[in-house]
UniProtKB/Swiss-Prot annotation:
EC number: 2.3.2.27
Reaction catalyzed: S-ubiquitinyl-[E2 ubiquitin-conjugating enzyme]-L-cysteine + [acceptor protein]-L-lysine = [E2 ubiquitin-conjugating enzyme]-L-cysteine + N(6)-ubiquitinyl-[acceptor protein]-L-lysine
Name this protein carries in UniProt: Probable E3 ubiquitin-protein ligase BAH1-like
Pathway in which the depicted protein is active: Protein modification; protein ubiquitination
InterPro entries according to UniProt: BAH1, SPX_dom, Znf-RING_euk, Znf_RING, Znf_RING/FYVE/PHD, Znf_RING_CS
Family assignment from sequence similarity: Belongs to the RING-type zinc finger family.
Pfam families: zf-RING_UBOX (PF13445)
CDD domains: RING-HC_BAH1-like, SPX_BAH1-like
GO molecular function terms noted in the UniProt entry: catalytic activity, acting on a protein; transferase activity; zinc ion binding
Domains as described in the record: The RING-type zinc finger domain mediates binding to an E2 ubiquitin-conjugating enzyme.
Domain SPX: 1-163
The keyword Amino-acid biosynthesis is annotated on this UniProt entry: no
Keyword Zinc: yes
Length: 335
């Protein structure tokens, strides 16, 4: 079965009720745009519209032109909008799902009360399954259509567009929220996601107490993702991790140190000109994501290490707080 048929079957399958309220890649529409692209063998009408020539039907669909303004305007503009909407929807739904899982205070009490009447945990797990399938199928659709674009135009514009998506932080399978979703499954005791009614792959966390801790996601369609859980600053397993806007993950204390802010002030107090220690991109601290599920995973899977790091961070935080307020006192009273 071709991917177009598989994608259509997915859109009209069991999750159709969910997909009706969210954006997805218009795979067939974009494919039709590529099929109509005969730029090298077309003429222009009097009003400037592109019309395929009579001889174009005898030629192959492959276009030798490196640039195709008509196709590019319709194709990349639409695809960028779709990818942005998909990434935004995925981010908002995962954030809502995880907020329910780690809720505190009165909201936590109300959720526990609801669980007396409904299986709330099962509902969260089911939505997580749907979101994994949603992001995976759309990521495959984007990859397939960009590959087809490069084949039709004999160019590398599709590859360049993927790099642009990564720069714009909308590459679907490189989202910190996907890591959080994987950690959520492990925290729920579901090391094998395929235990449910559909095959959604596997999630595994390996070598937590060794030199190279990793989180592995084996998604549908044989997609394997591996995320390094080593902080690039302290070279240890990330503790109280934050993902910067650029996607790099650091310990909270390490990121604060790199941005020249105190731990108790928080990572989002970093100046706008602060740069990522790895890629050196500025302005990545303001939209940092607190990886709460990943932090809980490390707390349960590596208890001794977590306790040691917690004591060290608290000690350093108290030390920094004392120094800060001593300096403030001296500044106020003059000595």
């Amino acid at each position: 079965m071709k991917f177009g048929e598989t994608f259509t079957e997915y859109l009209h399958g069991e999750e159709e009720w969910f997909l009706e309220k969210c954006r997805f890649v218009e795979y067939k529409k974009l494919k039709k745009v590529l099929k109509k692209c005969k730029t090298c063998n077309s003429t222009k009408s009097d009003d400037g519209q592109i019309i395929p020539s009579a001889t174009s039907s005898s030629l192959s669909d492959s276009c030798e032109c490196k640039a195709c303004p008509w196709c590019d305007q319709m194709f990349f503009e639409e695809l960028m909008k779709e990818a942005t909407d998909i990434a935004g929807f995925f981010r908002s739904r995962v954030r809502h799902l995880l907020h329910l899982h780690v809720a505190t205070g009165m909201q936590r009490y109300m959720i526990r009360l609801r669980r007396c009447f409904t299986d709330e945990k099962q509902a969260l797990v089911q939505e997580g399954q749907i979101l994994i399938q949603y992001i995976t199928m759309n990521a495959i659709a984007i990859r397939k259509i960009l590959k087809k674009y490069d084949k039709v135009h004999s160019s590398e514009n599709g590859k360049n567009f993927k790099l642009k998506m990564r720069a714009e932080r909308i590459e679907l399978l490189h989202s910190p929220w996907l890591i959080e979703l994987g950690a959520f499954y492990l925290n729920s005791g579901l090391d094998n996601v395929g235990n449910f009614k559909n095959s959604f792959g596997r999630v595994a966390c390996e070598n937590l107490n060794e030199d190279q801790p990793v989180l592995k996601l084996m998604l549908p369609n044989s997609i394997e993702l591996e995320y390094d859980l080593t902080c690039a600053i302290c070279l240890e397993t990330v503790f109280n991790p934050y993902a910067l806007k650029c996607g790099h993950i650091f310990c909270n204390s390490c990121a604060c140190s790199a941005a020249s802010v105190l731990i108790f002030q928080g990572i989002k107090a970093a100046p706008r000109h602060s740069k990522c220690p790895i890629c050196r991109e500025a302005g990545v601290y303001a939209e940092a994501v607190h990886m709460i599920e990943l932090h809980l995973l490390l707390k349960t899977r590596s208890k001794e290490y977590w306790k040691e790091r917690m004591m060290n961070e608290r000690s350093e935080m108290v030390k920094q707080s004392k120094m800060f307020w001593n300096e403030q006192t001296k500044h106020m009273i003059g000595y």
